[in-house]
Amino acid sequence: MEARAIARYVRISPRKVRLVLNLIRGKHVDEALTILRFTPKRASGIVAKVLKSAIANAENNHGMNRDNLYVAKAVADEGPTMKRVFPRAMGRADIMRKRTSHITIVVKEKE
């Protein structure tokens, strides 16, 4: 049995989120939350919120025991990119890409 939580359209680059997700993949949920608490990245707070949601879904919707849960899957997919004008010298302009992410965390029970 697995439980999942998804945060969609999060205004942070998927590349930056993946750095944090790589730290917690395969870990026990309590250990993962501790790692996130001491990781000095902006994405760690967002990922912690999604992980807590996945844990709550597992306990309330599927009746799983928190002591046996581990992070089975943690992915950050690319969401839509907002394009903005970035003024440059001599009247030119570049496109600034404000990237968004879809963060998915799946927790499972260890047998």
Swiss-Prot record:
A GO MF annotation of the entry reads:
structural constituent of ribosome
The keyword Transcription regulation belongs to this UniProt entry's keyword annotation: no
Record-linked Pfam families: Ribosomal_L22
Per UniProt, the keywords (alphabetical) are: Ribonucleoprotein, Ribosomal protein, RNA-binding, rRNA-binding
One biological process GO term for this chain?
A: translation
What are the GO cellular component annotations? cytosolic large ribosomal subunit
Q: In its keyword annotation, does this UniProt entry include Ribosomal protein? A: yes
Stated family: Belongs to the universal ribosomal protein uL22 family.
Oligomeric and partner information? Part of the 50S ribosomal subunit.
Q: Describe the function of this protein.
A: This protein binds specifically to 23S rRNA; its binding is stimulated by other ribosomal proteins, e.g. L4, L17, and L20. It is important during the early stages of 50S assembly. It makes multiple contacts with different domains of the 23S rRNA in the assembled 50S subunit and ribosome. The globular domain of the protein is located near the polypeptide exit tunnel on the outside of the subunit, while an extended beta-hairpin is found that lines the wall of the exit tunnel in the center of the 70S ribosome.
Q: What is this protein called?
A: Large ribosomal subunit protein uL22
Q: What is the lineage of its organism?
A: Bacteria, Bacillati, Bacillota, Clostridia, Thermoanaerobacterales
Q: Gene encoding this polypeptide?
A: rplV
